[in-house]
Amino acid sequence: MVLSPADKTNVKTTWDKLGGHAGEYGGEALERTFTAFPTTKTYFPHFDLSHGSAQVKAHGKKVADALTTAVAHMDDLPGALSALSDLHAYKLRVDPVNFKLLSHCLLVTLACHHPAEFTPAVHASLDKFFSAVSTVLTSKYR
């Protein structure tokens, strides 16, 4: 999926507005994913998955940091996310559907925290961006 110049602007502008909260939102979205889609917990048997878990928050920050990298490299997502793609495809073997589930929970989390900024255009742009990131992360499964 190709991001238009307007999509890129929407994503960058929205991500910039998150400020220091990206890691917090990443943790919240990950917790939301585990709650709404319990099968996603199978990849984290060594984690404390309870509400407010430090491990979930730390992993959520990693997710947010990876997305921050992706936002900074929207014109070269495959290059920017190559190592992460290798990790998820070859070592962790995460079912690709889980990226879609987490993307949905990220959209919900961002909409809850920034309802005024979460216009239909921004929603569509973020959805396309998360889809593009998911496609890159699953590209090495083939």
Curated annotation (Swiss-Prot):
GO function terms (MF aspect): haptoglobin binding; heme binding; iron ion binding; organic acid binding; oxygen binding; oxygen carrier activity; peroxidase activity
GO biological process, one term: hydrogen peroxide catabolic process
Keyword Oxidoreductase (UniProt): no
PROSITE patterns per the UniProt record, alphabetical: GLOBIN
Domain Globin: 2-142
PANTHER family given in the database record: HEMOGLOBIN FAMILY MEMBER (PTHR11442), HEMOGLOBIN SUBUNIT ALPHA (PTHR11442:SF48)
SUPFAM superfamilies according to UniProt: Globin-like (SSF46458)
Family of the protein in this entry: Belongs to the globin family.
Lineage summary: Eukaryota, Metazoa, Chordata, Craniata, Vertebrata
Binding-site positions, O2: 59
Binding-site list for heme b: 88
Key words of the record: Heme, Iron, Metal-binding, Oxygen transport, Transport
Entry annotated with the keyword Lyase: no
Role of this protein: Involved in oxygen transport from the lung to the various peripheral tissues.
Record note on quaternary structure: Heterotetramer of two alpha chains and two beta chains.
Expression tissues: Red blood cells.
GO cellular component, one term: haptoglobin-hemoglobin complex
Protein name (record): Hemoglobin subunit alpha-2
Domain of life, source organism: Eukaryota
